[in-house]
Amino acid sequence: MKDLLNLFNQQRQTLDFDAIKIGLASPALIRSWSFGEVKKPETINYRTFKPERDGLFCAAIFGPIKDYECLCGKYKRMKHRGVVCEKCGTEVTLAKVRRERMGCIELASPVAHIWFLKSLPSRIGLMLDMTLRDIERVLYFEAYVVTEPGLTPLERRQLLTEEQYLQARQEHADDFDASMGAEAVYELLRMIDLQSEMARLREEIVVTGSETKLKRLTKRIKLIEAFIESGNRPEWMILTVLPVLPPDLRPLVPLDGGRFATSDLNDLYRRVINRNNRLCRLLELSAPDIIVRNEKRMLQESVDALLDNGRRGRAITGTNKRPLKSLADMIKGKQGRFRQNLLGKRVDYSARSVIIVGPNLRLHQCGLPKKMALELFKPFVFAKLQRRGLATTIKGAKKLVEREEAEVWDILEEVIFEHPVVLNRAPTLHRQGIQAFEPVLIEGKAIQLHPLVCTAFNADFDGDQMAVHVPLSLEAQLEARALMMSTNNILSPANGEPIIVPSQDVVLGLYYMSRALENKKGEGMVFANTSELKRAYDNSVVELHAKVKVRITEIETDDQGLRNKASSIVDTTVGRALLSEILPEGLPFVLVNTEMTKKNISRLINSSYRMLGLKETVVFADKLMYTGYAYATRAGVSICIDDMLIPLEKKEILGEAEQEVLEIQEQYQSGLVTAGERYNKVVDIWSRTNERIAKAMMDTIGTEKVVNTDGEIVDQKSMNSLYIMADSGARGSPQQIRQLAAMRGLMVRPDGSIIETPIKANFREGLSVQEYFNSTHGARKGLADTALKTANSGYLTRRLVDVTQDLCVVQLDCGTAGGLTMTPIVEGGDVVEPLKDRVLGRVVAEDVLLPGNDDEPIVTRSTLLDEQWVAKLEEAGVQSVKVRSPITCESPFGVCALCYGRDLARGHLVNMGEAVGVIAAQSIGEPGTQLTMRTFHIGGTALSAAAIDNIAVKTSGSVKFTNLKYVEHANGTLVAVSRSGEISVLDTHGRERERYKLPYGATINVKDMAEVKSGQILANWDPHNHPIVSEVAGFVRFIDFVDGVTVIEKTDDLTGLSSREIADLKRRGSQGKDLRPLVRIVDKKGNDLTIPGTDLSAQYLLPPRSIVNLQDGAPVGIGDVVAKIPQEASKTRDITGGLPRVADLFEARRPKDPAILAERSGVISFGKDTKGKQRLIIKDADGSEHEELIPKYRQIIVFEGEHVTKGETIVDGEPSPQDILRLLGIEPLAAYLVKEIQDVYRLQGVKINDKHIEVITRQMLRKVEIVDQGNSKFLNGEQVERQRVIDENAKLIARNELPAKYNPVLLGITKASLATESFISAASFQETTRVLTEAAVRGTRDNLRGLKENVIVGRLIPAGTGQTYHSQRRYSSVGLTESEMETLVGRSTSSGTEITSPSKDAIPLGSKVGF
C-alpha cells in the first residue's frame, strides 16, 4: 500500500519529459490502469446522494469524495492516510484522485474499436486485406467469415452467408472454423504473423504489374511496418476490456430543485454496462444464438457510440433529441479539449473596458481607471499594506481596500509605478494587437489609449473594448518592457515601415500648418531664426501660411563622424518653420519643408528611426502628435454642402456620353454589333465619362484663382475642406469625393456584373428613386461580403499559423550557397517594385559585381543589405542580385538568421529564436480582411481601361531585345514570332528603366540597341486579333478547305470584301470530322517550303473561328499575316481575385483548366487528331518525341515549327504550381507564388515583404516523394519529410550503399499542417480523429519541437526567451557545459564568413544576438 501511496506522491510532481508517444493500449495495460471493474450502471443513490458500490461513481474504485475521509465515515483525517476501509472499501486519501483513477469494464464479447474500423483508410481492413463493407458485415452479424479453413476448399477470410455456412457445415462437418462478430475478426487479427506477412508482401511488390495493386500493397507494407516498429499488436484494435474515464472528468452535478446535470459520457457508459451485463446473463443461460447475436450487435453499437457517436449509423440522442457528446467529440473541434482548453485559456488578473482617446498621454502610457487598477493589483497592494504595517493580516488589508481608504490610493500609485500592463484588442490578428504600456491612474471607468497606437490595434473610439492583463512575475514584466512595450514596436513586422504613424486629425493639423498660400500677411519677410519668427507669428505680424525666408541651423555629420552646425537661409512658410522646432537634431529640415501629407509624415518617421534610432523617434512622434492636435484645433476645418463643388462641364460631358450610347444602340439595332459588344462598349463609355467628370470636379475643387503679390491672377491649391482632407490623407479619397460632387457612376449587381445605366447624379444633387434603388444593390452586397470575408480571412490565418508554427531561427548560418535571384518587378512597362525594395534587409548569397566590370565586387557575399548598401547598388545600376532565402535555407529544423535577413520590426539581423513562421503567417493573414471576395469578370470596372495596342517609351535611352525571335518584313519593320520576347529601355548607364512583353505578331518599329526618345512608339499590334505570321515568302495553298464544311465564306456588306472563316468543330458534320484546314506556303512550282532552321514544312494549322483574307495561290512575303484569330473567345475567363485567390495559391490547388507546359525543349509539330483531342508533338534535339493530347476546346498558342523550351506555356491558361515545380524547379516556383500573391495584395495597396511568402513556401515544400528507394527503408512513391531523407541518405553514403532519389513535392498549407511530424500539432488543427488514429497505429513519438505542442503540454515555447530554457534543458540532460553548448547551438557561422553591415546596428560575431 505504501508503494501505491508513493506512486501518487510522485505523480504530483510534474513529470519531466522530452517527448510524448502515443500507441494502442493492450488489454493488459488497460487493466493495469484500472482500480476496479465497474459492474453496475448505477451512479448515485437518489436518497443519500452517495455513489453506489461498483457503479460508475463508486468510491471504492475511484477514491473518496471528501479529502481523507472514507464513504461510511469510519476513518477520517490525515492519520488514517492510506487505510482501506473494510466496510465501504474506500481508500482514505485526497479526493482529487477521482480525477486520475480509471476503472474498466470487462466486455463479455470483444468489440471493434470504431476509429480503426471506420477512420479511412480502415486499418483493420488494410491489415486483413478485406474491404470495409465485408468486415462490417461480419462485425454486425450479417455474414460468417472463415477463420481456419482446415483441409476444406474454403479460403481463410472468405465470407459466407447463412445458407452458404449451413451448406458448408453439411459438406465438411467440423473440418473448418467460421464465426461472426468481433470474435471472428479478433481471431483473424491474432493469427497474423507480421514478419512473415511483411516478407510475403515485399516479394509480391517486386513482381506485381498493376498500378492499383501496387498502391494497395504499398499501403499494407507501410501499415505492417508501423505495427512492427511500434510494437503494437493487430488484435489490440479489437477491445476486450473497456477503460472507464475517472468520474470527476464526467461529473454529475446536483442542480437546485433536486435534478441533476450529468455529462453525456455517463449515459453512454450506462448503455454499455447495461448491454454488457445483459449479454453476460444471456450467455450464462445459453440463450438462442439469434438473441445473443442481437445483444452482441447492440453492445458493439453502444461502444461505437461511446467512442465516437454518429460515426456509424444514426447518432444516439439524449432526452432532448440532441446527439450525445462522445469521447471523440470531447477532443475535436473548436469546443474540444485541444482548442478550447489547451490552446486557449482564460487568464486571471485581467479586466476589460471601453477605450477612449488619451491625447495627452506619452507613447508608452495608457490611462487605467483607478477602480480597475485597484482590483488588478490587489495582491501587490495587500502585500504592501502589510509591509507598511497599515494592516496586520490579509483580511485587514482586504477591508482597507474595500473601504477605499486614502492610503490605499497612495500605495496603489507606488505599486503600479513602472509595472507595465498588457493591453489587447480582439481580434488579435498580428503581434501588434497585444502591447505593453505603463499605466497612469485616471478617474472614470474607460481605458485611455494613445492615439498613435490605434493603427496597430486597428482600434477606434466608437465603442471598442480592450482587455488589460497584468504580468506578474519579474521575468514577465521584463519581457513586457523589453519586447512588448509600445515604444519597441514602431515598425510593422509585415513590411518594416512605421506603424506608429499619425492619422486623421493629427495629419490634418500638420498638413494645414505646412501649406503655403499666395499673398498672405507677411509674405517675403526674412527672419534670423525660428524664435524670431515665432514672436512675429504670436503677435499676428505674419500668417501661418505665408511664404517667408528663415535662417535654419542644422546639425550635420561629416565623413569622419564629427557633428557640425550648419546654417542656411531657406525659402519656407511660417508653419513649416514652426514645425522645424520640434525636429530632433540630426534630421534635415528638407524633410518638413514640404506639405505634410500622411505619406510624407510616414517617410519622416521612417527616416528618423533609421538615422537617429528608437528613443529619439518615440519622443519625436509624440511631439508631432501634440503639434498636430494643436494646429488641427486652430485650423477649425469643417465641411458644408457648398464645399462639394459640382463642375460646370458636367452637363456637357453627360450629353456627349448619352449621344455615344444612342449611336451604339442604333448600331446594335441595325445588327452591326452583338449584344455583348454593345454592353461592353456602353460600360466603357460610362467608365470613361465618370473619369472625365471626376477629373473636372477635382480640378474645380482642388484649385482656386488668387491674386499674388505682383497683382497677377494665379492658380493655387485650394483650401477647400473636403479637398484638404483627401489630399492630406487624413480621411476620404478622391473616389468618395467623386460620389459627393461628380457622379456616382456605375453600380455592381450582387453577382459582380455591372448595371449599364449609371447613376448620373451625385449625393449633393440627390439620387432619383430608380438611382437609389440601383445603388442599394451594390451596397447590400458590400455588407454581405464583409461578413463572409471576416470568417474566411480568419480561417486562412489559422491555416497559415498552423503550417508555420514550428519555424524559428535556430542558427546563425547554415552555410548554403543557394538563394533566389531578385530582379525589379515590372508590369505593363512600369517598375511596380524596384530592386532596392526587394533586396533591402536581405543577405547577399554571392558577390555582386559592377555591371561591365567582373573583377570588382560592390557587395561581398554574406553582407546584410541595409539602406546604404541598397543605395550603392542602385547607383551602380545593378539589375539582379542573388540573395539568401528561407526557401533555400539548409537548417535541419527552422531557418538560419542569414537566410532570413533583417528582422523587419527591429531593423537589424534577426535574433536567435525569433518565431519567424508565426510572424509570416500573421503578416499575410492580417490584411486578409481588406482583400476582396469577389471574382472579377473581364470587362468590369476591374478592367475598364481600353485595350493596350502599342508600346510608347516613357524615358529616353536605348532599346534591348530579350528572348525575342523576329522576322524582317519587306517594308523594313520587324515582326515578332516568339511569345516570351521582351523589349527593355536602358538609360545611359545601362540601367533598365522599362520593360515590356511583346505579343506574337507585333510590328516592331526599331532595331535592337537603337536609340529612342521619350514618347516614341516602339511596337504596335491588333489587340482584338491574334495573327498567324508567315516566316517564309512564297504562295498560299489551301489544304482541306471545303466550302460549307470546314470553311464558311463571308462577304462584308459595307466593303464587299470576302473572307473565309474556319467552321467550328461542332458544325462540321460527319464528312468534315477528319479534315484539318491549314495554309501551306509553296514556291512557284508548288513544292513545299520549309521553315528556316528546321526540316518542318511551312504550314499553319488554322484553329476554329480563324479568318483568312487571302485567296488561294496569293503571294505572301516574310512577316505577312496569313490568318487571324479573333481574341474575344479566349478572354472570358474569370479572374479570381482577392482572398480566394490567395487561399488557392497557398493551398496549391490546380486551376480548373490549367495551362499546359512543354514537358521538354524542342520543336512543335501536330500529329493526327483523335476524337475530341488534338495531338501535339514536341521533338527534342536528340530526335525523341513527346506527345501531348489536348482537348479541342483549349486554345493552343504555339504553331507548327515553333521552338519551345521546357516549362514554356503551350496551351493558354493559368499554370499549375505543381507543374512549375516539376518542370522548372524550386526557384521559378517561389518566384511565381511570390509574384501571384503579391499581385493580389498590391491591388489593394497592402505592402507585405516577400520573405513572409517565402517562409510559407518553405513549409509547403517540406516533403519529398521518393522516386528510387535505393537501399533505404523508404518505399517508392512515399512522401517523406525532406530532412529525414537527407539524414538517411547521409548514413547510406557513409556505408557505401545506394541513397534514395527524390523529387520535391508541393503541399497545400492544410495538407502540410496535417503532414507535420508532430501529431499533437496536427490533431489540434483539423481531422483530430484521423490524425490520432494514424499516430496510434504508428506509435508516433512527438518530440515537442514546435510552439503549439509546447503550449499544449504547458511549457514555455521554444522561441524567443523560451529558447534558452529549451536549449539548457536539452543540453543539461546530455550533461554539456555552457561553452560546449554555445559551440553546438552555433554562435559562429559554419562557413567562416563574417556578416558585414555598415550601419551602426552591426552585430559583432560571437556576441549573443538579441536578449
Curated annotation (Swiss-Prot):
PANTHER family: DNA-DIRECTED RNA POLYMERASE, DNA-DIRECTED RNA POLYMERASE SUBUNIT BETA. Residues 1387-1411 are annotated as: Disordered. It catalyses: RNA(n) + a ribonucleoside 5'-triphosphate = RNA(n+1) + diphosphate. DNA-dependent RNA polymerase catalyzes the transcription of DNA into RNA using the four ribonucleoside triphosphates as substrates. InterPro entries: DNA-dir_RpoC_beta_prime, DNA-dir_RpoC_beta_prime_bact, RNA_pol_asu, RNA_pol_N, RNA_pol_Rpb1_1, RNA_pol_Rpb1_3, RNA_pol_Rpb1_3_sf, RNA_pol_Rpb1_4. Its EC number is 2.7.7.6. GO terms for biological process: DNA-templated transcription. The gene is rpoC. This is DNA-directed RNA polymerase subunit beta'. NCBIfam families: rpoC_TIGR. Mg(2+) binds at residues 460, 462, 464.
